[in-house]
From Swiss-Prot:
Protein name (database record): Isoleucine--tRNA ligase 2
GO terms, biological process: isoleucyl-tRNA aminoacylation
Example GO molecular function: aminoacyl-tRNA deacylase activity
Subunit structure: Monomer.
Chain span(s) of sequence motif 'KMSKS' region: 590-594
EC numbers on record: 6.1.1.5
Length: 1033
């Protein structure tokens, strides 16, 4: 075995291991070795390579890697195909910025073809950084053969899906109000909108709509979007709701009866009450009357009107509201558009022409006030949708779009979702399920440039549509020869003209590109160019056993995968979804570069190592919980877990090499109870870890392993050190080596999916083979000893209580104490005699015994809890307090047992006192200190005799010399002669404990003499000791 370089940095170790993996093709071997095995399928959600990875990506990649590595070691074949999401507006915006242009008009002036070429060049801007990040974090995924959404084979598969959907009659062209980004100048789908809501304060207005042919009668309508008022064509009431005409300051206002108090506040008189249906067809004068409105400006009935807020009357602007549009269509009212594609007013609103509508609310309100049409204005806080790509506020805007009739197969969506296991479970019928329940048809088209072209050709003469499902299909119907290398992007596909099979007319492609979420949702099929190629491979890799991405993908990729698959095949594309929580800063705030609180995962890997980062992300909390995260979290993972394990591994290698121990040779071994215990813990942990991983409970699995590693380091190795230090090779020492070797090899397999680098380093050095080509550990039931584990757990509890006791009373462990008394509060069959020596040695006490009668060593004190007792006992409180103080110890003990006592007041009143009213304090017998955990109480005799004090000094000296040896980098097995120069009192103490010193310090000879200032000095409290070590001959 190679010596472990404890000074090697984590990054140095990981770089060395990565090089080994690459040279020996370990990743490739791990897949090849499972050829013919059952497949376990996971899909890689495609990131965009025109942005840098963040710490959320580190969590996602870690989780996916843990799953893939574990399932591979569990015997499955796990293909891991990387992917790149390369289309869409973020790419376009980046290119616009690079070119110094802005907006669709300037793009078209620049030229669509050169613009498309620039987009294609830019999509892999950060591919190198993504590859380096992916490799550095240890995520094994095939980045040499990824699926790429811009490539022709991928797009052709997407076309086949869309063509099939069109064939089923589910793709249609419609005019409707859709969420619209005026900055990007394109509409969005409902699941895109769901990703960008923000809480904002907008100016709201209660507007006066004058009833026609009346002197002073007004409908009051409330709106949070005053900018839509110029497009008003109607007012809506609920036909069955009651409305009042109320007089206030000489005016008559019409509002919902339920809202009159909230709207008019005070000083009003209700004149009459009317059903909403009575108000229908009442005409009014619009605040911005438009001559284009030939049928409108009257009250209509609508079921969506409520009295939850506002006035109970809704102002209807059909161009800018989904409900408004539907009701106007059904009523046959006029349609009014006063805003252009940039979100600016047209000449229809002369005084605001060219102004962005969301910046115009104040202008509109001022105009209303000036015209005497403003009843009230106020700031209103509400959730408003913003563009998930550019952060601009969205408008609801009427226009022509291509839509997929998802609502027609809503039941399929819901049934498919019912078969999926969600982590966390509440997502299934909560956030995701509710989104499916409220789904609308998918707005699939985008009026942009860089994306998969919508494969629909329309006839100029008869409106017939043709949706080719392949390049061959398009070529077959083309009116002229199509280039062999036709690129499936604008403007190239736009040049392909098709002949109408119905009338022979010319057909041109509709100019839109598709929603990028449809691209990524098609990946189960398109990654293998299905159905054109790889049919068997696709069938083997569909559906996914699991997918894992951030919670923000709930209405993104998780939805688009489900939707595309349901529309195309009717089948569910995944069996399980791991919805990962956000990684927040240590204050619980979302990380962002603008706030300066974002952590760079590459920096974290370079500083602490990938194993530490991965472990920190896994062990802190379940991955679907939002987690507070910081450099400190990663540092703790490194020091508490990775470094602890490396230290144990280093200890084993060091002593095994010194003793020339060879695990492949046969030795006479005699396993101790400690060996049996650690092997039982190893296999019970293996059992728990496998169970947890099979249920995707990564944090539970990691914590089980962390507990085991801590026990191996701080209990097994520490309690076994004397065996490793002994000369020669006896049966118990051989057992210690054999046991620790088995423990380390098995732990390296257990942690391989979690911390792949340190696992590989340990396994490779101890066995000569890669851990990632091994099977995951299985439980050896014959080694499980639950009773032994329970007993050792009790011992550990007592030792921990003893240490805590010493800490609380400033008694160093090196200072021997006379006695430890253990009080057991619950009867059990624990054989403490078998563990007497361990407890005495660990806690450095000279005697140990178990006592069932705790009254011999403790008593109780009762103090009144005035905070709760004061209000309860009133005038009796002081008398109760005095009574408590004079209770006998038997009476106090009875109160502690029964948890109640009765005080008879001077008035004869009986006052019941319970544990809620009293603070119970356990007091140790004089000369003892106590610490308890409810199950056990540890009593330590704190009287330190002169003899004990002297031994404590000797043990402190041993500790100081051991530290000094480490500073000199002396071999651990080197015996030395020691010369000391110190005061006479310390000389005498050390002489009296010469045997103890020689046993613990590998010292052959101790002598005292005069040393010069050039020799080194040790500090024992305030005492200085000069020391000189020399190797024995």
């Amino acid at each position: 075995m190679k010596k472990v370089d404890v000074k090697e940095s984590a990054v140095g170790r990981e770089t060395r291991i990565r090089k080994q993996w690459n040279e020996q093709s370990i990743f490739e071997q791990s897949i090849q070795n499972r050829e013919g095995a059952q497949s376990f399928v996971f899909y890689e959600g495609p990131p965009t390579a025109n942005g840098l990875p963040h710490v959320g990506h580190a969590l996602g990649r870690t989780i996916k890697d843990v799953v893939a590595r574990y399932k591979t070691m569990a015997g499955y074949k796990v293909l891991r195909k990387a992917g790149w999401d390369t289309h869409g507006l973020p790419v376009e915006l980046g290119v616009e910025k690079q070119l110094g242009i802005s907006g669709k008009h300037e793009i078209e002036e620049y030229g669509i073809e050169p613009f498309i070429k620039k987009c294609k060049e830019s999509v892999f801007t950060y591919e190198k950084q993504w590859r380096e990040f992916t490799e550095s974090i240890g995520y094994w995924v095939d980045m040499d053969d990824p699926y790429v959404t811009l490539e022709n084979p991928y797009i052709e598969s997407v076309w086949h899906i869309l063509g099939t959907i069109h064939e089923k009659g589910l793709l249609y062209k419609g005019h409707r109000v859709s969420p619209y980004c005026p900055s990007c100048q394109t509409s969005l789908s409902s699941h895109e909108v769901a990703q960008g809501y923000k809480t904002v304060k907008d100016l709201s207005a209660t507007v006066k709509f004058k009833v026609k042919d009346s002197e002073n009668e007004y409908f009051l309508g409330w709106t949070t979007t005053p900018w839509t008022l110029p497009a008003n064509v109607a007012l809506a009431v609920h036909p069955n709701m009651e409305y009042v005409k109320a007089k206030q300051e000489g005016y008559v206002y019409i509002v919902a009866k339920e809202r009159v108090q909230d709207v008019l506040k005070e000083d009003y008189e209700v004149l009459s009450v009317h059903k909403g249906e009575e108000l229908v067809n009442t005409s009014y004068t619009a605040p911005f009357p438009m001559k284009e409105v030939t049928n409108g400006y009257h009250v209509i009935a609508a079921d969506f009107v409520t009295a939850d807020s506002g006035t109970g009357l809704v102002h209807i602007a059909p161009a800018y509201g989904e409900d408004d549009y539907r009701v106007v269509q059904s009523e046959g009212l006029s349609f009014l558009h006063v805003v252009d594609e940039k979100g600016e007013y047209t000449e229809a609103v002369p005084f605001l022409k060219g102004k962005f509508v969301k910046d115009s609310d104040v202008d509109i309100v001022r105009y209303l006030a000036k015209e005497g049409l403003l009843y009230h204005k106020e700031k209103y806080e509400h959730s408003y949708p913003h563009c998930w790509r550019c952060d601009s506020p969205l408008l609801y805007y009427a226009g022509e779009s291509w839509l997929i009739r998802t609502t027609a197969i809503k039941d399929t969506f819901l049934q498919n979702n019912d078969t999926v296991t969600w982590y966390p479970d509440h997502m299934k019928h909560g956030r995701f399920g509710k989104f499916l329940e409220n789904m609308v048809d998918w707005n699939i088209s985008r009026n942009r440039y860089w994306g998969t072209p919508l494969n629909v050709w329309e006839c100029e003469s008869c409106d017939h549509q043709f949706a080719p499902k392949s390049i061959a299909d398009l070529r077959k119907h083309s009116t002229k020869e199509t280039p062999e290398d036709l690129e499936l992007h604008k403007p190239y596909v736009d040049e392909v003209q098709v002949s109408c099979e119905k009338c022979g007319g010319a057909m041109n492609r509709t100019p839109e590109v598709i929603d990028v979420w449809f691209d990524s949702g098609s990946m189960p099929f398109a990654q293998y160019h299905y159905p054109f190629e790889n049919k068997e491979l696709f069938e083997d890799q569909f559906p996914a056993d699991v997918i894992a991405e951030g919670i923000d993908q709930t209405r993104g990729w998780f939805y688009s995968l489900l939707a595309v698959s349901a529309l195309y095949t009717g089948k569910v594309p995944y069996k399980r979804v791991l919805s990962l929580g956000h990684v927040l800063d240590e204050e619980g705030q979302k990380m962002s570069k603008s706030k300066g609180n974002a952590l760079d995962p590459v920096d974290l890997v370079n500083q602490f190592g990938a194993d530490a980062l991965r472990w920190a992300l896994l062990v802190d909390s379940a991955p679907w919980n939002a987690k507070r995260f910081s450099e400190r979290t990663v540092l703790e993972a490194k020091s508490k877990f990775v470094d602890t394990l490396v230290n144990v591994y280093s200890f084993y290698v060091l002593y095994a090499n010194l003793d020339e121990y060879n695990p492949d040779e046969t030795y006479d071994v005699k396993r101790t109870k400690l060996d049996e215990w650690v092997l039982s813990r190893l296999h019970s942990t293996t059992k728990k870890v496998r169970t947890a991983l099979d249920d995707y409970q990564f944090t539970n699995a990691a914590r089980e392993i962390a507990t085991l590693v801590d026990e191996v380091s701080n209990w097994y190795v520490r309690r076994s050190r004397n065996r490793f230090w002994e000369s020669g090779m006896n049966a118990e020492k051989a057992a210690a080596y054999e046991t620790l070797h088995e423990v380390l090899v098995t732990i390296s397999k257990l942690i391989a999916p979690f911390t792949p680098f340190v696992a590989e380093d340990i396994h490779l050095n101890l066995t000569g083979s890669s851990v990632h080509l091994e099977d995951y550990p299985v439980v050896n039931e014959s080694l499980l000893q639950p009773k032994l584990e329970a007993e050792m757990d009790a011992v550990l509890q007592v030792v921990e209580l003893g240490r805590s006791n010493r800490n609380q009373h400033s008694l160093k462990v090196k200072q021997p104490l006379a006695e430890l008394v253990l009080l057991e509060h619950n009867e059990n069959d624990m054989d403490w005699e078998s563990y007497r020596d361990i407890v005495m040695d660990e806690l450095n006490v000279k005697a140990f015994h178990v006592e069932l009668d705790e009254t011999k060593y403790t008593s109780y004190q009762l103090k009144l809890n005035f905070k709760t007792a004061g209000p309860k006992f009133g005038k009796n409180v002081n008398a109760v307090n005095d009574w408590l103080k004079q209770l006998s110890q038997d009476e106090v003990q009875n109160f502690v047992t029964t948890e109640r006592a009765v005080y008879e007041a001077a008035s004869g009143e009986e006052v019941v006192v319970t544990t809620e009213d009293v603070l119970v304090e356990k007091v140790a017998k004089s000369g003892f200190s106590n610490t308890t955990n409810g199950q056990y109480t540890v009593m330590l005799d704190t009287n330190v005799t002169e003899e004990l004090l002297q031994e404590g000094v000797a043990r402190e000296f041993i500790r100081a010399v051991q530290e000094y040896r480490k500073q000199l980098n002396l071999p651990v097995n080197l015996r030395v002669d020691v010369i000391l120069d110190t005061e006479e009192e310390l000389q005498q103490t050390l002489t009296n404990h010469k045997q103890l010193l020689e046993e613990n310090l590998l010292v052959k000879q101790f002598t005292f003499g005069h040393l010069t200032n050039e020799d080194d000095e040790l500090s024992l409290g305030e005492t200085k000791v000069r020391i000189k070590l020399s190797a024995t001959k």
